[in-house]
């Protein structure tokens, strides 16, 4: 009798557990995200006189890689490989091309697209802006930015880390919640 009661209790527990699991909402797949390489707008006198610097070009590539890596690690996005459109993207001015970033992201099957711009005012004063767009509508979801001091790999990395952790991964992408 005791064995039958324990068996019935186990069966009821398993049935209840199965019902709970089946009634739980299904998790949607994370949105597909294309993160393009960052671009530089150099308004400094140094840039006008000396032209492009290889260390800044390297930092631009590292910034895009860092955004991709940190967003992939968050598991909130499914990162897409931009290689199929990368050459075309590099031939465009993504931050001012009238939506070509969205078109490239559509070709990849993305839901969202990120572009980034570093504006160099001087070798001391820079600004990083990251734009997140809805690929289906072309609408800007958010634009996040920060100023940084010092044109070093460390300062760029810290600025990117701040924007990803405190803005892009924040609820509502860091924007105030509607009341």
Language model region names:
Residues 28-45, 65, 73-74, 102-107, ...:
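C-terminal/domain-edge helix-coil "capping" segments
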Residues 1-9:
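N-terminal secretory signal peptides that target proteins for export/translocation
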Residues 53-85:
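N-terminal, post-signal-peptide region of Sec/Tat-exported proteins
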Residues 23-25:
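N-terminal signal peptide c-region/cleavage motif recognized by signal peptidases
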Residues 72-115:
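Short, solvent-exposed, polar/charged sequence segments at loop or secondary-structure edges
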Residues 48-58, 90-91:
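Second-shell loop/turn segments in exported
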Residues 12-21:
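Bacterial N-terminal signal peptides
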């Amino acid at each position: 009798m005791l064995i039958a009661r324990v068996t019935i209790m186990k069966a009821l527990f398993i049935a209840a557990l199965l019902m709970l699991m089946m009634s739980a909402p299904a998790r949607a797949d994370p949105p597909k995200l294309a993160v393009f390489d960052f671009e530089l707008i150099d308004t400094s006198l140094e840039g006008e006189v000396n032209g492009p610097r290889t260390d800044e070009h390297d930092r631009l590539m590292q910034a895009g890689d860092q955004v991709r890596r940190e967003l992939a690690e968050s598991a909130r996005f499914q990162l897409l490989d931009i290689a199929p459109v990368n050459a075309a993207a590099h031939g465009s001015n993504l931050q001012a091309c009238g939506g070509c970033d969205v078109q490239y992201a559509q070709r990849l099957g993305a839901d969202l697209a990120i572009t980034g711009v570093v504006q160099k005012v001087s070798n001391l004063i820079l600004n990083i802006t990251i734009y997140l767009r809805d690929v289906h509508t072309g609408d800007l979801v958010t634009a996040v930015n920060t100023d940084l001091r010092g044109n070093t790999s460390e300062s760029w990395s810290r600025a990117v880390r701040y924007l990803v952790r405190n803005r892009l991964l924040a609820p509502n992408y860091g924007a105030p919640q509607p009341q």
